[in-house]
Amino acid sequence: MNLLEYEAKAIAKKYGIPTPEGVLIERPEQVNEAVEKLGLPVVLKAQVPVAGRGKAGGVKLARDPDEALELAEELFSKEIKGFPVLSLLVEKAENIQKELYLSFTIDRTNRKVVMLASAEGGMEIEELAKEKPDAIVKLPIEPEVGLKAHEAREVGKRIGLSGQLLRQFEGIAKTMYKIFEDYDAELVESNPLAITDRGLVALDFRMIVDDNAIFRHPELEASRERELSELEKEAARWGFFYVELDGDIGIIGNGAGLTMATMDVVNYYGGRPANFLDIGGGARRDRVKAAVNVLLKNPKVKVIFVNIFGGITLASEVAQGIVDALSESNVKKPIVARIVGTAEEEGKKILKEAGIPLFESMDEAAQEAVKLAKAA
């Protein structure tokens, strides 16, 4: 789950990390009060749960009140990477001398936390790694030991810091690592972490929290709800594992492995999955009906591919759920099905009587789904 910048900065401030003074606004006209409180110049920052706002035009500098109001109106009218701008963080502009980069994330290959730092902040780390890989300092951290003070200092030296700035960097690094641990984070990032007249200041602060750990942080539950689309909320109410993607072929499977394999096969044959939807084991007809309805409501979905391997899940229940959804919905979309396992013959009979195409292999079903999507 991506926290909005103002939410992440509230956590940073609570832990003592220096950040710019800021005011959150939810309407353009509120920028006037923010300017009066903060003084000029100010930076207006769109609050959306994605990286790369600057390049997308979501961060603006205002030097006078009229410009601040004009830019606020412009930003509130924007949609950034698919997210409408519902709030702005207005901050007092800092006198920046140099921009650094500092983050903690998970190295899944080596199963460790890794600290990343660079003397070249402001760029997205993926771009920096591609263009100047030697500019990034990487420090693997043993989870049972944590980040040691001398390790943080050594990283600071390698990105050119010394004296008071080095001591401050050590403190900020150790604090960011503590936040990373305390909040079950997948990413804690300051980009840029700037050298200013008052020392190091986290001009931007990002946090991604593991969705599976949200139950340990009930104060973040509202943030998670905000990040979900209406269809994702509907799926969550049924207990589905549902993630929206950019394609046009709806995917329904039972079990994460089979569902991901289905997505892979669709990709292999030139299609693009519109989602991941795992109905889980033992799904009854009402759950299957609800899953199909979610994809029928998704305007991006042109065709639905249902791939079920029945163990404790009865193929007959799956088939009846599909038929129920199609018969009760005003939205009509082609469905391709492959169902095998428990109550397979009964399930196939139900689908054949409903005129739903059935396939024996996943490959054949995927190819048909791709063909239908391209023809739609």
Swiss-Prot record:
The keyword Magnesium applies. It is an enzyme of class 6 (ligase). ATP binds at K45, G52, R53, G54, E91, E94, E99. It catalyses: succinate + ATP + CoA = succinyl-CoA + ADP + phosphate; GTP + succinate + CoA = succinyl-CoA + GDP + phosphate. Mg(2+) binds at N191, D204. GO terms for molecular function: ATP binding; magnesium ion binding; succinate-CoA ligase (ADP-forming) activity; succinate-CoA ligase (GDP-forming) activity. GO terms for biological process: succinyl-CoA metabolic process; tricarboxylic acid cycle. Residues 9-234 form the ATP-grasp domain. Pathway: Carbohydrate metabolism; tricarboxylic acid cycle; succinate from succinyl-CoA (ligase route): step 1/1. Keywords: ATP-binding, Ligase, Magnesium, Metal-binding, Nucleotide-binding, Tricarboxylic acid cycle. Its cofactor is Mg(2+). Pfam families: ATP-grasp_2 (PF08442), Ligase_CoA (PF00549). GO terms for cellular component: succinate-CoA ligase complex. Binds 1 Mg(2+) ion per subunit. Succinyl-CoA synthetase functions in the citric acid cycle (TCA), coupling the hydrolysis of succinyl-CoA to the synthesis of either ATP or GTP and thus represents the only step of substrate-level phosphorylation in the TCA. The beta subunit provides nucleotide specificity of the enzyme and binds the substrate succinate, while the binding sites for coenzyme A and phosphate are found in the alpha subunit. Heterotetramer of two alpha and two beta subunits. Belongs to the succinate/malate CoA ligase beta subunit family. This is Succinate--CoA ligase [ADP-forming] subunit beta.
